[in-house]
Amino acid sequence: MRIPSFLFVTVFIFLMSCHQKKINHDLFLPDDLEATLWAQSPLFYNPTNMDVDIKGRIWITEAVNYRNFNNDSIHFLHHQNGDRIMILQDTDGDGEADVSKVFVEDKDLVSPLGIAVIGNKIFVSCSPHLLVYTDADGDDKPDSKEIFLTGFGGRDHDHSLHSMVAGPDGNLYFNTGNAGPHLVTDKAGWTLRSGSVYTGGTPYNLTNQGNMKSDDGRVWVGGLALRINPDGTGLKVMGHNFRNSYEVMVDSYGNLWQNDNDDQVVACRTSWLMEGGNAGFFSNDGTRFWQADQRPGQDIFEAHWHQDNPGVMPAGDQTGAGSPTGMAVNESDALGEDYLGMVLSAEAGRNVIFSYKPKPKDSGYDIGKRTNLISSLPQDNERYVWNDSAQNASNNKWFRPSDVTIGTDGAIYIADWHDPVVGGHQMQDSIGYGRIYRITPKNKNLKAPHLDLTSTAGQIEALENPAINVRYQGYEKLKAQGDRVADDVMSLLKSSNPYHQARAVWLLSQLGEKGKTETEKLLQHTDTIIRSVAFRALRQVEKDIIPIAEKLSDDPSSFVRREVATALRDLPYEKTKPILLKLIKQYDGQDRWYLEAIGAACDGHAEELYPEIKTLFGGDTQKPEEWNTQLASILWRLHPAAAISGLKARAVSSKLSTKEKTASATALAFTSTKESVHAMIDLTKCNDSIIAEQASYWLAFRQSNDWFNLADWSKVGNAINLEHTRMLSTMKVKRGIILDKRQSFNEKKWNVQAMAKNAIGGQMLLSMREENSLPSELYPVVENVIFNNPDLGVRVQASNYFKKPGSGKTFSITEIAKIKGKATSGDTLFSKNCSSCHRVKNKGMDIGPDLTGIKNKFEQEALLDAIIHPNAGIVFGYEAWLITTKRGDSFFGFLVADGAQAIVIKDLDGARHTIATSTIVSRKKQSNSLMPEPSSLGLTDQNLADIVTYLTMMK
């Protein structure tokens, strides 16, 4: 029987009164700050996100009904009428909440992940909907409910629709994770189509796909940062290809800041997000996971975020393993000068609030040194493992900050999910306990101001407020007054707080012709950031921004010029080409942000621009090996087909460094013509062994995706042995992970298991053991797997280096092969022991591979080997697929790429098979299963001979 909520609260209060002293409220934080427990359950439960209203109250989204498909609601607190939105308030000003009320309890709310309180409209993010509740009469109850947007993927999933905030431009910003597809149409009819190869995580996330075009003609993939007008029109992608950025935060300059979590490796990050930036989690079209694209020699962080690929933005600060959540930018003076401008990033896995002090660098931002601003632990662990119960046993590790925000009083508020684990759609805290901490300066009493929106002075005060969605209300009220408040707003340009100045710039551009004229004057301001904000603001109000872009194309700051390049991406190329060439000419050859901005502006026009770009840098009169850094870098980014011969020449030049030659080979790999393939084949024959090996890798890799239709791969493969090259590259990557001291034990374990199951990987492990380079703690892991390696030579050699675990009866393939089998007995034995997983013609199930045509794939001894050593190729932890072709072949394995022309299956031995989609009859996703060893089924030598005879003699 499910426990009623009211009874649960009674039990909760009793338990809390008995065990209050056992809950650790202590936090480690700077000496000049102090933390107080502002609120805790039962005022609310399981907080996922929060916001602040104009009264200084905290609004909370609860996720009590959290993943009921994974967490039995009978044993956890459950709200039968749906999850709730709660309002918390400190009515007596003593620094602790004393009142809570339910704003809404709604069955449409299933673990909502975001809330924005914007006046009397409360936006709630809960895939597939972005909902808006309107409290028209101010009684803290919704009078209406509207689906503001719908079509987001990720129902009841962490990688889904996240929170919304109001930007300084008057628009709304929000983001979503990679649990697509996201098929969203705004109120003007513009449609976003975004997806990727990622499925799973919940029972609802079953279908997804990459390489979809939105109405702007662009391919957006994975997680997204989005902007929309308050009326629901003007949906625009601000960044894409995230894994699962939990919250994208916009500051008063219009900068976007985001954190993103990893694929259970040490690759979480925090970064500045340039408009339109590609964060690099999937391949550019979303049809491949990062693991499929990892190259030999790349570390996990580089590969995880595709850092060596043209078209991908810099990844920012590598924070290690973890579960990053909410973000905030402190624009308040209340905490003191040291904290002004601090970017705060909540890290639920690591029990910490990270902080940064970003500064402009070149044309972008250096996010600065990461510090552990607030934590429940004295020391941080970058190799944290989310489901390590032993490590999470101590309740000081149950501090799980799900969100961080700045209140109207200037204090930092931290929502604490509070649970032994975070991740994997799990929770272990059955009572739904949650907390909110308030961080303030010592010896300073911060008070929430009374904001009067009926007067200009009150509206200015609201605009200055540190609570992001509160200042939006001041913005809107002042904007409605038009140019008559221009002078009042201009007074903020003299503020000692730079964020107040920036807010004034944005608002001025909206205050009629007078305000716009004053904003244009700011394009000549001595401060680079003010000039850039003025340009950003004018982009949104000027019908024709090209004349202003032309003026700023000679700005002394690369930061401003990069803003201009960013704007050109959305403008008619025929009108902006001269500006674009001027911007390209000023590229310094080093600045990656600038390079990516001009690369995006050149999108679709690289071939046309190639001759003129060469001329700009003198490349038209030089040999390719003489190209300067600027030209070489730009051609790496643009990789036009016209540059193939030059790129090939640079890749083999003895006058260039390995780094320069590698860059040219990489650029060549991102062109897609038959000439590209031929050039890469030629590189496999060059005298530089490093480049030759890279070229072999690129051919093996590109065969399955961009170059699939550009060559007769059977001929190329026979000449170069592409399959071996591909597998060798994969095993090299895994070996690098095992030898990387930064990786967690679990990460090494998964990779060493994969190597031990693979013929090439097994040989590598034996060599590593011989060299004493294999970590000793991995010996038991290898021993449990390697004796089932598909390569007989590996299995035989393994006994010289590893201890073979005890097993049942030992079968001899050679001896069984000599036994005369009976097909009729084999038929009976198959029905009894095998048909529950395997199908032969119309007999059996489709859980394992279809064995109808198995005799065409295996000789007798090979088939015996597969039956006797059933675990030889099963990769643990992934969902398998069964692919059937028109020829009758069956491929059982794991889908790593899903393109329009071909798919790639990694089979149970780790081999990758490229299959043309036109030859596929069916593709079925399989449940994880393990085929039992013959001895566990009580099978004898004669039984095995009978089964093999039946399978090989079947017509």
Stretch-by-stretch model annotation:
Residues 155, 421-422, 529-533, 540-541, ...:
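Inter-heme linker and motif-flanking segments adjacent to c-type heme-binding CXXCH motifs
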Residues 432, 439-829, 847, 854-856, ...:
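Long, ordered, helix-rich scaffold segments
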Residues 38, 120-121, 412, 504, ...:
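C-terminal capping alpha-helices of c-type cytochrome domains
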Residues 435, 507, 828-842, 849-853, ...:
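C-type cytochrome heme c attachment motif
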Residues 408, 415, 821-835, 842-866, ...:
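Sequence context surrounding c-type heme c attachment/ligation sites in exported
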Residues 19-458, 477-480, 842, 918, ...:
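Beta-propeller domains with acidic blade repeats across secreted/periplasmic ectodomains
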Residues 1-22:
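Bacterial Sec-dependent N-terminal signal peptides
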Residues 264, 498, 513, 745, ...:
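Short flexible coil/turn linkers enriched for glycine and charged/polar residues
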